[in-house]
């Protein structure tokens, strides 16, 4: 459903941001 798609997108975005932050340290 749409909620699943949004959840997946949120997870991908969170993972992307986390990776960026980790790489900055």
From Swiss-Prot:
Tissue and organ distribution: Expressed by the skin dorsal glands.
Any one of the GO CC terms: extracellular region
Source organism, top-level taxon: Eukaryota
Location(s), subcellular: Secreted
A Pfam family per the record: Antimicrobial15
Secreted recorded as keyword: yes
One record GO biological process: defense response to bacterium
Residues where Isoleucine amide is found: 25
InterPro entries given in the database record: Antimicrobial15
Keywords: Amidation, Amphibian defense peptide, Antibiotic, Antimicrobial, Cytolysis, Hemolysis, Secreted
Its job: Has hemolytic and antibacterial activity.
Subunit structure: Monomer.
Protein name, as recorded: Syphaxin
């Amino acid at each position: 459903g749409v909620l699943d798609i949004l959840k997946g997108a949120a997870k991908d975005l969170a993972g992307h941001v986390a990776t960026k932050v980790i790489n900055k340290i």
